[in-house]
Amino acid sequence: MQSRIVGLAPAFSLFPNLNTPHKTFTFHQILVLIITFTAYASFHASRKPPSIVKSVLGPPSLNSSSIDNGWAPFNGTQGTKRLGELDLAFLSSYALGMYFAGHLGDRIDLRYFLVFGMMGSGILTLVFGLGYWMNVHTLGFYMSVQIVCGLFQSIGWPCVVSVVGNWCGKEKRGLIMGLWNSHTSVGNILGSVIASSVLDFGWGWSFVLPGVLVLVSGVVVFMFLVVSPNDLGFEELGKEIEIEMSLGENVEESLRKHEAEGAVLLENVDDSSFAIGFLEAWRLPGVAPYAFCLFFSKLVAYTFLYWLPYYLRHTAVAGVNLSHKTAGILSTVFDVGGVLGGISAGFISDKIKARALTSITFLALSIPALIMYRVYGSVSMFINIVLMFISGLLVNGPYALITTAVAADLGTQDSIKGNGRALATVTAIIDGTGSVGAALGPLLAGYISSRGWNSVFFMLIVSIFFAGLFLVRLAKSEINTMRSGELIASSVP
């Protein structure tokens, strides 16, 4: 047997019982899902502090011209615009870095690369928080930290999706990745709660604790993560076994044989897979429409991510203005809805085998949900929570589906013969394009909010419309496929 154990994580030397045959394939599969879940949840937890501290750094209200409150240089009449520019600094470098990260991720050890990104992200998050104790009031300092931090953060997503794609086959991929992708919302919730809880002690603490969380998670990844089943001698499920069926073949018997093979030890490891080029990946069927759909979907999701606590702080609910801490914690309801949205979208798309149709349905329903939230969200706390939950469910559903199951499907599709090394590149293209929208959304919100929040919500609704528009052709194709399947089924005696 050709050995691939040299690059195994240190924990497998310290704890020999973790190796095969002491532990099953399923055990390692679950372990990988837990580790990558924790890793990316910590990434998102460290992104949340800027949105929580906005109401502390910026002016007390949109109409205020006072500089007696807040934190220079964000507390003047241009405060909201500068906060939007700060978001742009992080998210634009994140989007740019995403393309390079995916390209590199297909070519170097994913465990080392992921740990490198986590350590850099944790340190830069800590450095931003140090600005509080060092009494830094220079815009360039905070912009520079956010730009470099965005580059480190961009490493995370292509790495974790590629690893999970190696360990999980296409069967129930939507549901599994829908559950797994709740790390985004869980991380947002965790980051919001941590940052809000320590905000009264000084806004610097809101960055320090999430930064430490990323560093600790990075150590766990370095110690335990196994990038591919091949490293333990298992067959890689991301590379689907082709089952050739002719008219005279017993299909049921072939399927049973395929399932019985399961996860078997490899006698020889095939290293023939190759990384595809950036432009070649763009030309893969479905990549461009989903990438541009995610551009607008992520624009909406990240506008909520970065501005919802600020919106809640400056919008009276039942005639009462919320405190900084209450607004930050209340904003987690949107992410709780997002958890259910990602799981629901994955489950439904698995059942009907139509990713685009599922996404476009969620997007269409999110438009009236956002209108209702803006109009009726201030009536009472209960109505605000219910409508925020529904909005989070519908907005994050397609976003979660596209960044996980769809990206994994496109990166392992038949046109590239299941080339697993294309997965990180395809993932980076889709999420990188989405991240350009994510950078644009919070920036526009910072400028448009000076005209009133109705203008911001109008921008979000228009963005959702365009997101759905890019999937119309794919959805029509899926509907035709479903109808063809029904006709074939009805013709069978």
From Swiss-Prot:
Gene3D superfamilies: MFS general substrate transporter like domains (1.20.1250.20). InterPro entries: MFS (IPR011701), MFS_dom (IPR020846), MFS_trans_sf (IPR036259), SLC37A1_2 (IPR044740), Sugar_P_transporter (IPR000849). Disulfide bonds: none annotated. One of its GO terms (biological process) is phosphate ion homeostasis. The keyword Membrane applies. GO terms for molecular function: glucose 6-phosphate:phosphate antiporter activity. CDD domains: MFS_SLC37A1_2 (cd17344). This is Putative glycerol-3-phosphate transporter 5. Keywords: Membrane, Sugar transport, Transmembrane, Transmembrane helix, Transport. GO terms for cellular component: membrane. It is found in: Membrane. It comes from the Eukaryota. The keyword Transmembrane applies. The chain crosses the membrane at residues 25-44, 83-103, 113-133, 145-165, 185-205, 207-227, 292-312, 328-348, 352-372, 375-395, 428-448, 452-472. Belongs to the major facilitator superfamily. Organophosphate:Pi antiporter (OPA) (TC 2.A.1.4) family. It is a multi-pass membrane protein.
